[in-house]
């Protein structure tokens, strides 16, 4: 009953109706408190009445603070029994009024699906910007959310950009409701996947955009996986309905089949391709058209075009049947052969979407300024507000026991730094406030470093513009200046020892050496490296111990090229780069026993350590495992710890190529010590020597990264594309042939894909495109392995000569 009341309150959104809905569960209702207070007042004098009402407000505030404190205790002591419904039920009515109208959303999709174009329309229709500008900066301005010159030149989003806007929508009774939307536009290219990861980590919902022609593409599948990782409810928006070959029903089917999430269309297009005019809302059975120079005027009518009336009835029935599969209330109505009301359908869509059982599918064309406003209405109707989303933390005072975060302003502050960015005013740290209030001038504590930090300035970001604010409440997103931290750090006000889990960070797959062309640029080069590694966890920098070269690592060629270009533009540092290097790995395939003794004596105390045991492949490639099975104390604990350090040092740089070792296990079950000559260093060195010998005797292998590659090109170039893949010994997993284009899905070794982009363009007259993402490590071909090992041994011999 409580959930129904909340949903009814959400959809009707008038304070009188919310009061009546909540009075079922609790009396007196929140909204009636001031009315009750006024009716009880014994005074007729105005000033005395005001004083009495003010006193009642203070009493009510204390009561809500007491309730909030009890909820906080339950969140710590027994989080599993604290439901989101109970959290909402005990919200201060003023807080409920604010939070119920907040939406934290991201826009994510495959590259070139129209994310930034759609975001530009959202900002225009909400009044956040006064004019629409297109991607690639064709009008010398460029889209608002692409603030970097590189983004506007290349027509791609490189960094996620945050903004906020207010959307006024009409409810079913025709009354206006204002919603506050915090919006993050994310990149589509796989090389910048960390930007999507950290955006989704702090958001409550998302709009997943699909191309009406291509449907579900490779990066769509990656985005879906990321949304599932963080339990993000999503609305699907089939964009580019005005393109030749647009087929929204194929996209809906692919969401169901490829992404394996129940989906149904909430709209039917009125016309397609050049004749796309608008959509029919299947919930309310109304035709919706965009009018005006930029589609800013919405015209609704009950007159549905005659040629699609039957299709609309059919698709509405499909929607109800799909909802009956995922929602009990609609299932009952469906089994009783009754027709659900509009309110029941909307409530069911909302329940199923928030519980991750369903995704509603909208349709439109952002570039043609059509059907973006109904998508905004759907964000407000079907995606959750912050109080409806479960967020967990770990309590360090209770052995990192899980605790639930409660989105009340009155509780102790907890926030997560999810993105760092350098600005002209210094380091900018983006923070999602999960609990409590963040105020200008307050002190916060970094849970990782235990450092106390004062917040000098709080701003709301609008791409690269900012608006200063004095404070920000639970459920909101902001940015602060002057905070020294790392991406993923948790902040509290010091009253709670909470820490939040950070976002998933994939491992880099490609490296190259880099140095400034001119020695005088070294200070700026170092500054750039320091800044980029702080901002981007997937961009790694290290110095090779032998060559003393600076090595940068990242997610792909484009990823590293962008940083090299940014150094030139932002720091005026011209760089020389070496050939890209693949991040190979090493492993062993057979068990090998070892009995190794390190013995050095040169007068005085020497070195002595004996280690006995075996090495073998670990259960999975994802781990290296050290284990001791010593009995009788033949090796003391401190020496065993030194053995483990020796093992970890050995896995960091393998014997074959000097790359990391994966999937290897070492067990030490015996050994010997000397009363004078044994030391921790001796046992560490002995373990490393034993590791090298055993590893080389255990049929070692070089592992190379395989990339999940997706190539799309016009049908007439299919033979050329397949030929390119065959030359690279790619394994073709699937091929989809459409009316005009085909798509090939293949596994390719990263080593073979250098320079593929230019060859693909040449073979397809510039019409082909491809994307890659890391799939898994696989044994390298024997010939390649021999070449790599021989090259490494030759380099080592030259260095030691």
Curated annotation (Swiss-Prot):
Organism: Pyrenophora tritici-repentis (strain Pt-1C-BFP)
Keywords: Elongation factor, GTP-binding, Mitochondrion, Nucleotide-binding, Protein biosynthesis, Transit peptide
Protein name (database record): Elongation factor G, mitochondrial
Originating gene: mef1
Targeting signal (transit peptide) range: 1-65
SUPFAM superfamilies, sorted: EF-G C-terminal domain-like, P-loop containing nucleoside triphosphate hydrolases, Ribosomal protein S5 domain 2-like, Translation proteins
Top-level taxonomic group: Eukaryota
Gene Ontology terms, MF aspect: GTP binding; GTPase activity; translation elongation factor activity
Matches recorded under PROSITE patterns: G_TR_1, G_TR_2
Main function: Mitochondrial GTPase that catalyzes the GTP-dependent ribosomal translocation step during translation elongation. During this step, the ribosome changes from the pre-translocational (PRE) to the post-translocational (POST) state as the newly formed A-site-bound peptidyl-tRNA and P-site-bound deacylated tRNA move to the P and E sites, respectively. Catalyzes the coordinated movement of the two tRNA molecules, the mRNA and conformational changes in the ribosome.
Subcellular location: Mitochondrion
Ranges for domain tr-type G: 100-387
């Amino acid at each position: 009953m409580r959930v129904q009341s909340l949903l009814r309150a959400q959809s009707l959104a008038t304070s009188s109706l919310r009061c009546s809905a909540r009075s079922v569960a609790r009396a007196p209702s929140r909204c009636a408190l001031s009315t009750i207070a006024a009716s009880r007042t014994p005074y007729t004098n105005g000033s005395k009445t005001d004083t009495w009402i003010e006193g009642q407000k203070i009493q009510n505030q204390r009561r809500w603070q007491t309730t909030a404190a009890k909820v906080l205790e339950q969140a710590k002591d027994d989080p599993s029994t604290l439901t989101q419904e109970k959290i909402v039920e005990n919200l201060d009515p003023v807080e409920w009024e604010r939070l119920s109208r907040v939406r934290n959303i991201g826009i994510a999709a495959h590259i070139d699906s129209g994310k930034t174009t759609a975001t530009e329309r959202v900002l225009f229709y909400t009044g956040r910007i006064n004019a629409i500008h297109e991607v690639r900066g064709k009008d010398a301005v460029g889209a608002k959310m692409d603030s970097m010159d590189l983004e506007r030149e290349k027509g791609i989003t490189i960094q996620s950009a945050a903004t906020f806007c207010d959307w006024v929508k009409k409810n079913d009774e025709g009354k206006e409701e204002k919603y506050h939307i915090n919006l993050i536009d994310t990149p589509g290219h796989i090389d910048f996947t960390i930007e999507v990861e950290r955006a989704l980590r702090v958001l409550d919902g998302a709009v997943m955009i699909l191309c009406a022609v291509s449907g579900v593409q490779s990066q769509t599948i990656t985005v879906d996986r990321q949304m599932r990782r963080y339990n993000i409810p999503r609305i699907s928006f089939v964009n580019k309905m005005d393109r030749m070959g647009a087929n929204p029903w194929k996209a809906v089917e692919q969401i169901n089949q490829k992404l394996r999430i129940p989906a149904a269309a909430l709209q039917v297009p009125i016309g397609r391709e050049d004749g796309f005019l608008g959509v029919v809302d299947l919930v309310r059975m109304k035709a919706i058209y965009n009018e005006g120079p930029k589609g800013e005027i919405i015209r609704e009518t009950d007159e549905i075009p005659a040629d699609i009336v039957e299709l609309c009835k059919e698709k509405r029935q499909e929607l109800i049947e799909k909802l009956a599969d995922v929602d009990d209330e609609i299932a009952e109505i469906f089994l009783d052969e009754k027709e659900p009301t509009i309110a029941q359908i909307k409530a069911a869509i909302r329940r199923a979407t928030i519980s991750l059982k369903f995704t509603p599918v909208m349709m439109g064309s952002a570039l043609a300024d059509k059907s973006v406003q109904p998508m905004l209405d759907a964000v407000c109707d079907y995606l959750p507000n912050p109080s409806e989303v479960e967020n967990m933390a770990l309590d360090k005072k209770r052995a990192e026991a899980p605790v639930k975060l409660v989105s009340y302003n009155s509780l102790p502050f907890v926030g997560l730094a999810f993105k760092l960015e350098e600005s002209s005013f210094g380091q900018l740290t983006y923070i999602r406030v999960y609990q409590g209030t963040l105020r200008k001038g307050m002190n916060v504590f970094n849970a990782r470093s235990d450092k106390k930090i004062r917040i000098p300035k709080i701003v709301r970001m609008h791409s690269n513009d900012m608006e200063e604010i004095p404070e920000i409440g639970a459920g909101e997103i902001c940015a602060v200046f002057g905070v020294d931290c790392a991406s993923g750090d948790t902040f509290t006000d010091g009253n709670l020892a909470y820490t939040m889990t950070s976002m998933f960070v994939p491992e880099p797959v490609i490296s190259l050496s880099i140095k400034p062309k001119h020695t005088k640029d070294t200070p700026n080069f170092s500054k750039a490296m320091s800044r980029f590694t702080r901002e981007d966890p997937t961009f790694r920098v290290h110095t090779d111990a032998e060559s003393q070269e600076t090595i940068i690592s990242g997610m792909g060629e484009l990823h590293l090229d962008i940083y090299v270009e940014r150094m030139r533009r932002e720091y005026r540092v011209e760089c020389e780069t070496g050939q890209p290097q693949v991040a190979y790995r090493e492993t062993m395939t057979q068990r090998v026993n070892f009995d190794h003794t390190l013995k050095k004596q040169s007068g005085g105390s020497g070195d002595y350590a004996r280690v006995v045991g075996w090495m073998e492949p670990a259960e999975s490639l994802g781990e290296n495992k050290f284990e001791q099975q010593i009995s009788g104390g033949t090796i003391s604990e401190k020496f065993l710890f030194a053995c483990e350090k020796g093992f970890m040092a050995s896995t960091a740089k393998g014997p074959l190529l000097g790359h990391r070792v994966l999937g290897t296990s070492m067990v030490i079950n015996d050994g010997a010590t000397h009363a004078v000559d044994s030391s921790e260093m001796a046992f560490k060195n002995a373990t490393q020597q034993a590791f090298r010998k055993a590893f080389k005797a255990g049929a070692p292998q070089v592992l190379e990264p395989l990339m999940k590659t997706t190539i799309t090109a016009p049908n007439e170039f299919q033979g050329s594309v397949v030929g390119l893949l065959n030359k690279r010994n790619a394994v073709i997993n699937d091929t989809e042939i459409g009316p005009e284009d085909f798509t090939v899905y293949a596994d390719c070794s990263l080593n073979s894909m250098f320079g593929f982009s230019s060859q693909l363009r040449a073979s397809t007259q510039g019409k082909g495109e491809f994307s890659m993402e890391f799939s898994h490590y696989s044994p390298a071909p024997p010939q390649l392995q021999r070449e790599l090992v021989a090259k490494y041994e030759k380099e080592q011999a030259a260095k030691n000569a």
